[in-house]
Swiss-Prot record:
Subcellular location: Cytoplasm
Subunit structure as annotated in this protein's UniProt entry: Homotetramer.
Catalytic machinery residues: 5, 8
Protein name listed in UniProt: Xylose isomerase
Organism: Streptomyces violaceoruber
A GO biological process held by the record: D-xylose metabolic process
Transmembrane regions listed in the UniProt entry: none
GO cellular component: cytoplasm
Cofactor note: Binds 2 magnesium ions per subunit.
Amino acid sequence: GVTFHDDDLIPF
């Protein structure tokens, strides 16, 4: 959910 991960599981 941060950059391209809509799951917010990865801080990338």
